[in-house]
From Swiss-Prot:
Protein name (database record): Superoxide dismutase [Cu-Zn] 1
Disulfide bond residue pairs: C58-C147
Keyword set includes Zinc: yes
Free-text function comment from the UniProt entry: Destroys radicals which are normally produced within the cells and which are toxic to biological systems.
Family statement drawn from the similarity comment of this UniProt entry: Belongs to the Cu-Zn superoxide dismutase family.
Protein source organism: Debaryomyces hansenii (strain ATCC 36239 / CBS 767 / BCRC 21394 / JCM 1990 / NBRC 0083 / IGC 2968)
Length: 154
């Protein structure tokens, strides 16, 4: 059993916590989150980025984690970056709270997300269906108001 956490902070009012849990390398990873400070009633892009480097804010986290060199997609797509977690949905207070299971995201094994960065974006992820090159790369999710490095937890 492996558990990890990322505490999201940034240059904005957006903050939160994302937890990850995986029983074995072949099992899905359970991802839970509570993120506040977003716009009310919005979808906000939610991704694992390649680097655990936040020295220049969330920009230093690099591109989406993509060890298999796929195009950007939705979490349910086979053709997607490992780091493509889709969107979180905010309530009337701008809080996003939820959970999901993901077979591509791993805490255990060669393509672990440990030491990488979770980013919450300022815009909605179009899930690679935006009809332009940037959509196939980033989902046109926009700026990075908050992020956190994924570290082991108890």
């Amino acid at each position: 059993m492996a558990k990890a956490v990322a505490v999201l902070r940034g240059d904005s009012k957006v903050s939160g916590v994302v937890n990850f849990e995986q029983s074995s390398e072949s099992d899905p990873t359970t991802i839970t989150w509570e993120i506040s400070g977003n716009d009310a009633n919005a979808l906000r892009g939610f991704h694992v980025h390649t680097f655990g480097d936040n020295t220049n804010g969330c920009t230093s986290a690099g591109p989406h984690f993509n060890p298999f060199t796929k195009e950007h997609g939705a979490p349910e797509d086979d053709n997607r970056h490992v780091g493509d977690l889709g969107n979180v949905t905010t309530d009337t207070s701008g809080v996003a709270k939820g959970s999901k299971q993901d077979l591509f995201v791993k805490l255990i094994g060669q393509n672990s997300i440990l030491g990488r960065t979770v980013v919450i974006h300022a815009g909605t992820d179009d899930l690679g269906k935006g009809g332009n090159a940037e959509s196939k790369k980033t989902g046109n999710a926009g700026a990075r108001p908050a992020c956190g490095v994924i570290g082991l937890s108890e």
